Every structure is written in structure tokens, then in C-alpha cells.
């Protein structure tokens, strides 16, 4: 991993919550210090491009076989599988909205629901460390800054009620790393 930043305290978020957040720039399939990673999947859950394809390739064919048994996933929801050849225990698959021009309020609600669904699924499965990729920003065309703001606000809101999970925002691109740094200063 190239860079790691631990967030500072802000006025609106307690120091305790900020200590549960960090960002990493690098390949999500190589993160070794989390129990689960989040896959920005398509509705079929059968692999695709971007991070979805990378996770499927790194996990091996068993992931695809297990995903077939899940019969897809609705936009804004999440499902869990084993991680197989990945260095974590689980993969949480979530399907973000596809944005045509600029995101609608429904798109924003669905993206927030992706983060909420993953956090709830992690809590239900006693997952204490979770890494999120950037959901919907690649092939699904959600604007990076808006998506990051929704991600950070949703996760901070969840952590204000559930302080028993640590969250990593894993980003691959330098511009996303800068965006997350700006949002959490």
C-alpha cells in the first residue's frame, strides 16, 4: 500500500469515531489487516470490470461459484461470501447505482444504502474491520467527490451508533485519495 492517513478529530465527529477511520491507497485485493473487503459489484454478482473483476480474479473461481448461489443483488443492498484466495475472510458485495448524467436524489439514497447495507451485514456477521472501495465511481459514473462525501457521511453516522467496527476507505487513484483527505480534515 502506498499511503496511509489516520483521520484527525473534527468538530462534528468525536475523536473516538475518527480513530475508527483510515484511508489506504492501493489494491484492495492485497489488504491484509481487515476481516472483509467490499466489492463494488454489478447486479448479477458474477464479476465484471474494475474492482469487481480484480476481486473475482484474486479470489479464484470458488468466489464465482458461491456468487452464483446468491442469485444476484438489488441496487443498494449487500450480500456476503467467503474470500477464498484473498487475504481477508469475507467479501461483501454491494451494487451501487449507475448514473446517467448527474446523480439524482434517488441515486444518492441508493449509494448511501450500499454503505449502510455493508455495515449492517458486517455487524450481523461480527466483522470488526472492513475495507470499502469507491462504490459506483468507475464504470457506474457516479461523480467521485459526491460519492466520497456520501461514503464518509454515511460511515461516520453509522459509527456514531456502532463503535465496534473499524473502517478503511481503500482508494486506487490519487485523485480519490485527495478527495477523502479533504473530506476528513
Question: Where do the model's predicted regions map?
Answer:
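Glycine-/small-residue-enriched capping loops at alpha/beta junctions
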Residues: 2-125
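Phosphate/ribose-phosphate-bearing ligand recognition and processing surfaces
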Residues: 99-185
Amino acid at each position: 500500500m502506498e499511503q496511509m492517513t489516520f483521520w484527525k478529530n473534527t468538530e462534528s465527529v468525536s475523536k473516538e469515531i475518527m480513530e475508527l477511520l483510515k484511508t489506504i491507497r492501493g489494491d484492495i485485493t492485497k489488504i491484509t489487516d481487515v476481516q472483509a473487503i467490499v466489492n463494488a459489484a454489478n447486479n448479477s454478482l458474477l464479476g465484471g470490470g474494475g474492482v469487481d473483476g480484480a476481486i473475482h480474479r484474486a479470489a479464484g473461481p470458488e468466489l464465482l461459484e458461491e456468487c452464483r448461489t446468491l442469485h444476484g443483488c438489488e441496487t443498494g443492498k449487500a450480500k456476503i461470501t467467503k474470500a477464498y484466495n484473498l487475504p481477508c475472510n469475507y467479501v461483501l458485495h454491494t451494487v451501487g447505482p449507475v448514473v446517467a448524467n448527474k446523480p439524482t436524489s434517488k441515486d444518492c439514497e441508493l449509494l448511501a444504502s450500499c454503505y449502510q447495507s455493508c455495515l449492517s451485514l458486517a455487524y450481523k456477521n461480527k466483522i470488526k474491520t472492513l475495507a470499502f472501495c469507491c462504490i459506483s465511481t468507475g464504470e457506474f459514473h457516479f461523480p467521485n467527490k459526491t460519492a466520497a462525501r456520501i461514503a464518509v457521511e454515511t460511515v461516520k453516522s453509522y459509527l456514531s451508533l456502532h463503535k465496534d467496527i473499524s473502517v478503511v476507505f481503500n482508494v486506487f487513484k490519487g485523485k480519490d485519495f485527495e478527495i477523502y483527505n479533504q473530506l476528513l480534515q
